[in-house]
Amino acid sequence: MPGSSVDRVPEVAAALGVRPRETLVAPFGYVAIYDDPKVIADMQPDLDRVASFDRTALIATAPGLDGADIVIRVFAPSVGLPEDPVCGTAHRIIVPYWADRLGKKKIHSRQLSPRGGDLFCEDKGAVIVIGGDSRLVIDGTIRLPD
């Protein structure tokens, strides 16, 4: 589910406060591509503007730093999630993009949310394999009606 190019640069720039080099669109959200990972780390989005978009999320990404291939932040205030701490769905969109740009199938991604996290992804064509450390935060049983 990689994104396709779309000209939403002015709207995304207004929402994120920094003009992206390129914007992509996918069913889950818009993707803003930047050249500088520091821009992603320092980003202070206008969440009301982000919430007004016609997609669930706005994903900001750039080449990586400190050993990571890429960095990412994901904002989804329209569904009650100002910033997703670590978003697997967004990686289904950005990993094919970065795999192509970087010329490699295995991508180490660092999500720069306040909680943060590292994901180790592999582009296998129709499937994106995502792995990393996790922490159990809730345990229970869900019962669905017959």
Predicted regions span which residues?
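Active-site proximal loop and beta-alpha junction motif in alpha/beta enzyme cores
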Residues: 1-146
